[in-house]
Amino acid sequence: MNNLTLVTVLMLGIVSLSCQNSTETEIEKATANEGTKALDLSKEFKQHWFDGRAEVASYNLKQMRYGEAREGKAVLIFVKEPFLQDEQVKANAASSQTFDVLKLNATKKFTTGIYPYSIMQSTFSPLTTNTHAVKVTASTQEWCGQTYMQMNNRDAFKIASHSYFEGEADQSLSLNKTLLENEIWNKLRINPTEIKTGPQKLIPDFSFIRLQHIPVKAYQAEVQQQKNQDTLMTKIAYKNLDRILNIYQSTAFPFEILKWEEKTSEGDKNFTQAVLQKRLRLDYWNKNSNTFAFLRDSLQLN
């Protein structure tokens, strides 16, 4: 190979590597900037969610567990809160170090034979930018033991999981950022028409992961939406999991959740459903005196 040919080859290699690095850099930038669009909250949204009250909604629950339908209660609590990014906890008061989030506390209570189940999940979604949830937690308690799972949104999804089951025990892992089933509920309350539809990867509901003892990872799924008069249905169907989630909500603001269904390929034979009973707007954290116990009757929780 003569000197001219060698120089030409080296130059082509440098150009090729430069183009490749440039392309990779652009992809990284695009990925880093994906979903960082500022949220343009409407005046109606702010008047509703920034009024110092929460929405507490109770649901009649039919939960499938161990192949049988169990009667129970579900509660969805949506509230706007100040959030500390570094500590990733609710702040005692808003400050220059906080930003607003929409928090969902979702609970389920039902019994399996002699012993009770209690499930609670919390999802914190920013109200400043259209990004992923900043934190998700999930816990289950029953007489055999308890589990706890937490995701912190850092440079990646940092997940810690603890379980009394053999083979699960204590786990710590890092996942690439992708859509979380848990965060979809908040997104549907903020702006249901901005949900990304079509085939995509999702991390399933944390309580589903724990109850079904499946690996903590993203699974291929398809998200669809269908409007029927005054109701919007959002459907999540997982390709390699026997799971379909249908969420029904009002098309009118504040887009309240009317019911949801969790189905399998067996249809009605393995069918979880929660249907709205009552919905209240109140500062529930100030209602912890026995004199406010009647509010549980109002929510039909007793």
Across the structure, where does each feature detected by a protein language model lie?
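Acidic, serine/threonine-rich low-complexity disordered tracts
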Residues: 24-155, 194-302
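N-terminus-biased targeting/localization segments
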Residues: 8-13
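C-terminal motif of bacterial Sec signal peptides marking the signal peptidase cleavage site
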Residues: 15-18
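Bacterial N-terminal signal peptides that target proteins for export
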Residues: 1-7
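Bacterial signal peptide processing site
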Residues: 20-22
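Surface-exposed beta-loop interaction hotspot
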Residues: 151-200
